[in-house]
């Protein structure tokens, strides 16, 4: 069992110093049109390869400004909407004489340029990128042991960009990561 309660009584109207604390609000800023196509596939070959992938293509446009600001430009692209994105993976599994199953997998992901915001003062171009990952391992019904390399080329791809508190902050994908993954089913 648990329970909780809270009570508050606030008399002050100005509890933050507006000179140093930005006010955040969320509002519908614009109407937009989006024309797109997406798809995915999984294909199992006769020799135990699995090929899989997905893609999306987008054409976006801000069509009408709703917010009372000139910082939103009609005709510009939506934020975080790359013109295309795709990924493809190839995985091979084979039985071993020990009764275990070995596997190898490679994956490539690509993304086109995109923008970080629809507000012009906060809008930054996020360059397109491609990433590659690889893994190999052995498994059975009880456990999995796998070595992996994520971000094989060590690309510092920008995946998000904000101007929180009027300072640009860029988020990138994790750098090249090598690891060993062990999993045991109880």
Say what each PLM segment does:
Residues 12, 59-62, 154:
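Active-site micro-motifs of SAM-dependent methyltransferase domains
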Residues 1-7, 11:
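Single conserved hydrophobic/aromatic residue that forms the stacking wall/gate
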Residues 16-25, 67-74, 121-126, 161-169:
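Flexible, surface-exposed loop regions and adjacent strand-edge segments
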Residues 44-46, 97, 127, 138, ...:
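Surface-exposed coil/turn segments at beta-strand junctions on protein surfaces, enriched
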Residues 85-92, 130-136, 169, 180-182:
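Feature captures outer-membrane beta-barrel proteins of Gram-negative bacteria and organelles
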Residues 26-119, 183-185:
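Gram-negative outer-membrane beta-barrel transporters
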Residues 8-9, 109-119, 138-186:
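C-terminal beta-signal and adjacent terminal beta-strands/loops
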Residues 33-35, 82-86, 128-132, 141, ...:
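Residues that define the transmembrane beta-barrel architecture of outer-membrane proteins
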């Amino acid at each position: 069992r648990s329970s909780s309660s809270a009570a508050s009584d606030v008399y002050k109207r100005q509890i933050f110093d507006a000179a140093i604390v930005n006010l955040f609000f969320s509002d519908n800023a614009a109407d937009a049109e989006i024309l797109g196509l997406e798809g995915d596939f999984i294909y199992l070959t006769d020799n135990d390869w699995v090929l899989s992938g997905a893609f999306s293509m987008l054409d976006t446009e801000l069509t009408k400004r709703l917010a009372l600001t000139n910082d939103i430009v009609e005709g510009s692209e939506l934020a975080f909407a790359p013109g295309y994105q795709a990924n493809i993976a190839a995985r091979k599994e084979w039985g071993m004489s020990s009764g275990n199953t070995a596997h190898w997998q490679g994956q490539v992901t690509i993304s086109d340029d995109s923008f970080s915001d629809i507000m012009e003062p906060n809008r930054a171009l996020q360059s397109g990128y491609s990433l590659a990952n690889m893994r190999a391992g052995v498994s059975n019904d009880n456990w999995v042991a796998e070595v992996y390399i994520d971000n094989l080329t060590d690309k510092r791809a920008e995946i998000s960009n904000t101007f929180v508190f009027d300072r640009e902050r860029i988020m990138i994908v994790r750098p090249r990561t090598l690891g060993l993954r062990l999993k045991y089913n109880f």
